Amino acid sequence: MIGRMLGAALALGLVHTASAADLRPDQIRFREIYKELVETNTTLSSGSCTEAAAKMGARLKAAGFADSQLTYFSVPDHPKEGGLVAILPGTSKTAKPMLLLGHLDVVEAKRADWTRDPFVLIEENGYFYGRGTADMKVIDATWIDMLVRFKEEKYQPKRTIKLALTCGEETLAAFNGADWLARNKRDLIDAEFALNEGGGGRADANGVLQSQGIQVGEKVVQQFRMETTNPGGHSSVPIRDNAIYQLAQALLKVRDYDFPLTMNDTTRAFFAKAGAGRTDQMGQAMVAIAKDPTDKAAEAQLNTDRAFHSMLRTTCVATLLDGGHAENALPQRAGANINCRMFPGSTMEATKAALEAAIGDPGVKLTALPPIRGKSMPSPLDPKIMGPAEKVAAKYFPGVPVIPTMSTGASDALYLAPVGIPTYGVPGFWSGPEGSGAHGLNEHMSAKSVFTGRDYLTDLVKAYAGA
């Protein structure tokens, strides 16, 4: 239904190749920023976020930002994992600032595995290829590009606009800049709200844009260690009381346990709005669960979709396994890592208690692993955020709904919410049914998505900054 509203013209536009001859001068410069970021290696193993931050800071300074408006940060133990905070002052003494957040680091990419060099921005058949083209250097480039343009155009926002480019989002092994800023430089990034990755649109197999999503909250990651112990003995005289068997039974209990269905304003709005755009049985179930979360038939239907199943509850899954100490000995110890994605509002303690009750074996020890996550609350479904997102979308994506979403994954937003900065994943960019290859091989994004999303976000930030 939504696709028919768009019409053939938009469908054709989605697959248009943006050659250099077709680009406006401002788009050409944006492409240069995008290229510089993608071609600056920011992997943990061999790259440098500090270098990327310095390059972006140099562009801002060349545009007219004063040294006092640029703050570089890093810590001695992680010199290559630094970041940048930039500030464009607003004219209002009462309007609180807004924060643009972006992580510079990317997931590892091996040249031998890729069709093209992952650290060269390559445009081919209407798509940009390279590590970070989607996650999330396209947004980083957009933030830098718009601040450069605002400065050069002498645009004076009502709100102060802050930008934080950080490192460490893609791995727990790195220095996380967003976490460090929230704990050590809270005043520097103080804002009424933040805009981040996590939203975006989806096109169908014909290239017709179906929806744009705005992320309003996300799950919280919490790891648990499950362990069993036993005196062990010689494997020639086995007994049923075996640490590995005991652990296996506990893991099956975790597999078979479903946390209770939980909904909030965001997920209720998602299922109602996204379901209304479908004509199949799944769409009917989506609308039904939004109206009545106790509808067991609707829940059963939704549970057949792994993404919807996860959106409706806390989930826990075994991800790592170890056990035994010798091939000819009964195991003295066996263990597993349990990766939980807690629904906003849930606590580590409640999640642990639910798992222990499901396992039902006091001989299985469950321990929460650091970092211990506190209770995460979703960002409010605020009309001051949703309204401008929908209004600007009507200009760039006519007939396409903007749907509130809750991510089942996690981003650096998890560090901002606890310090009072609600964070929203922006709409704008989109991918097709095959996805963008983020974290995988041959990561890519369509040129049409890149340039249209960039224009959309520039107008959206102006709408927020002028309010």
Which role does the model predict for each range below?
Residues 21, 59, 199-455, 462-467:
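Metal-dependent amide/peptide-bond hydrolase catalytic core
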